[in-house]
Amino acid sequence: MKNCLVVDDSKVIRKVARHILESLNIRVSEACDGRDALNQCQNAEHDVVLLDWNMPVMSGMEFLQQLSSINVARPKVIFCTTENGLGHIRAALDAGADEYVMKPFDRDILESKLQQVGVI
Ligand SMILES: [Mg+2]
């Protein structure tokens, strides 16, 4: 069973993502900011990280930059953005994100992104 770390400061987004991912037979853990996510990545391996950009404490971008400095098997990273964050996509891909998805996302789009990064 693959596992996904859902990183978002919105409890509602985490809940929606969890629901979709579990329906795709993926085990889910949640982090509420980049720092929390980094700690969890140091403690357990994840196949994929679904990553929000704007979060308190540590942003998605800072998480991406620090992920490469910790000594773990690197998860695939799908960066989540809103239409307002379109300009962030290039920066996220440059910083090592594998794919991106626009919010609000649905099951079909998330499934196709997970296929594109080879998780399912
Ligand atoms: Mg956010």
Task: Specify the residue positions occupied by each region the protein language model found.
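C-terminal output helix
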Residues: 87, 105-114
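Short hydrophobic/Thr-rich beta-strand motif most characteristic of the beta2 strand and flanking loop
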Residues: 25-32, 40
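Charged docking surfaces used in two-component/phosphorelay signaling
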Residues: 15-23
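Receiver (REC) domain active-site loop signature in two-component systems and cognate sites
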Residues: 55
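Acidic catalytic/metal-coordinating carboxylates
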Residues: 33-36, 59-65
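Active-site beta3 strand of CheY-like receiver
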Residues: 45-50
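Alpha4 helix (beta4-alpha4-beta5 surface) of REC/receiver domains from two-component response regulators
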Residues: 62, 84-99
